[in-house]
Amino acid sequence: ARRIAAYKVNATWFSCNQEPPETSEFDLVENAHDVVLLAARVDHSPWYRFVLRHADRFLVMARRDSRPSKPFPLTADDGARARKFRLVDLVMLHEGAHSGRTAEWMDAIDAARVINIYNDACVDRLARIISGKSIALVLSGGGARAYAHIGAVKAMREAGAPIDFICGASMGAVVAACVAMGWSQEDMETRIREAFVASNPLGDHVLPVVALTRGGRVEDRLERHFGDALIENLSLPFFCVSSDIVNGTVRIHNRGMLRTALRASIALPGILPPVIDDHALLVDGAVVNNFPTDIMTTLHRGLTIGVDVAREGVIDIEAFRNPPGFFSWIASHGFTAAPPIISLLMRSATARRVSLDMPRPADIMIAPPVPGVELRDWKMYETAVADGYKTTKAAIDENWAALAPIISAAGRKL
């Protein structure tokens, strides 16, 4: 309660197993407070049923060495508003013996995200989430232009803006995963340089049958840097998106092997082979949703910041005017240079669609122009990072009134 109060939120709470108040009495309490916390044990008591009916959001708290009851008494039949709007979070308390039961809990309660409590900073994050003062960050796809996201994260960290929930599509998912792993700015930049800047991650070309590259370089680098990390065990709540081209829908990856989810999210059709998951064929998230602000604003109650680097794509039109044949291209450029078809496929996958159902915008929209950086300009790291930093720093200054109370409370020793 003390941590929530730091965010200037008028909150009250009801303890476990008390007699449910009359509806009119409870309405008065809700109208008089910003946040009303209802604490309950999972049982079949009248109080627990009251909580299920009235809660707008569920925070199911569990120890990592515990098992959920099956079936868990939190189903669509309960008619709970939180279930309707998918606002069910798992708060995993890392106490007791180690176990791998987080995914089991997520399945039991159909959790949208996991809030892991590893240390005191995680408790502060939970306080921001409960008070509606948390900050979520959405990172778009954009190939090498997504390096700008690294500069955006740097600007937010320097300003003291906490990142409490993060997601991304395509290359934006990779940068988001770096943040969710809890890596420092220096560590993140070192790893991105090694994985994508030092040598072309899409350089293992083959004669195209399924794709223009084998995908082996990308898979090796994802395994080297992310190992066997599971999404549900990350320091920050995280998800990324891929596109299921069997049924044309978005796949939300919020649990399971992180590197597998990232491999699906960056599988540009025709460039990287797709990822097969049971009866699904998963390709780059950018194909269906390159900027998943709509998903984030559904799951998140707080301030959402979106960084979109795909608004102003750069592509060399002259490369497609009277293009040479295959052998003429090889004679002029050798086997190491990427042919124009790669730029064409990448741009086709990440081009913004103009439609009536565009994703809901973030509260703060940041669009680094990233001038002169093409989607496959993997060597243009410094230029893209600098532009992302500069644009985000300016956006923070412009939106200081909205950010200052959160930054001030987050930086205060509670």
Spans of model-derived segments:
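Walker A/P-loop phosphate-binding motif and the immediately C-terminal alpha-helix
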Residues: A1-E22, V29, M171-G172
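Patatin-like phospholipase
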Residues: T23-V35, A40-C167, A177-L414
